[in-house]
Amino acid sequence: VEELDAPEPLTLRQLTGTLRRALNAVDTPETEREAAARLLHEFATAQDPVAGAAPEQWWGVNPLTTEEALFDAEEPVRVSPSKIETVHRSPLDWFVGEARATETTDLKRGLGTLVHDIAEHMPDADAVELIAELRRRWPSLGMPEGWTGAQELERAETMLRKFAQYAREMRTRHERELVAVEGGFQVLVRDSARDALLTGRVDRLEVDAHGRHVVVDLKTGRHKPTGADIPEHPQLAAYQVALQAGAGQAMQDSVQGEDLHGTDRPERIELPEGTVLTQPGGALLVQLGDATAKPGVQQQDPLDEDQQWARELITQAALLMAGTRFEARHTAEQENGSHGRSCAVPWVCPLCAQGRQVTEK
């Protein structure tokens, strides 16, 4: 195999990068290391200094800007059910997302938002009515005309047909009643290690034939958890803990008017350590965005009083979020996405080549 040399640096900035790499590489001969250090010193002290030449501009050797925790030690940590899995999988992913440093929302996510909004405001409509509303609002997405836009419109129509089928079968086959949409809750989950303020909204709140509340989460993405993941699915489990505290009845009681929407400022409910106030009826994901023709319903069975793992997931998430450092966790395969999930933040992740500091390369 023929070896190819990298092109010579053409600018002072490029040369500075080359010199810094030589200075930090463990296999650089001492004479070359000294020469690189002298040149970098000249670049840094020149009348017009070269950016990046001075050591104080090398992020890899600077001290941490702060080691203060994100939350006051006496305050409960606000935990969203949808973020629990992320912070357990990789605290760094969670932190970067909370800092709003991830990519902006794309058109396909806007499509999912539109489907959610139509389902929220027309929860009992049939497929014809839902699709008519979709086509009326379609131009607001700014989808490109042509084949791509037509494909996305067809996909959105399929999702709404699935939703209409789910809503119909919920009433007729499963004998559940819809009592609230986009209900909000705040549950203070007490724990000796760290209190968590479980805060979120639910797409649909239903009541089963036994009078128990059931949380329904509509999913418009293409990917879904496996059947083996559902019994301990973190987001569904967190919803059930909220129901154990009585959040279901609180959301139902806050409904104002026939549109089934509740208050935007739910009252805080406290769930004391080791107690269950209300028995939930379970929680489920309704998959609308996958490739199947029918809605895929993935249901987590009701939690009983002896299942403390769900509460521990929440309080352990609070501990991770309240830390001063956020660990990057993933396998090497994630960097290239060979197992279906790539690193979400490769530009800052020390486990990825792109995110390593110059002192680590």
Identify the meaning behind each predicted range.
Residues 1-361:
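RecB-family 4Fe-4S metal-dependent nuclease core
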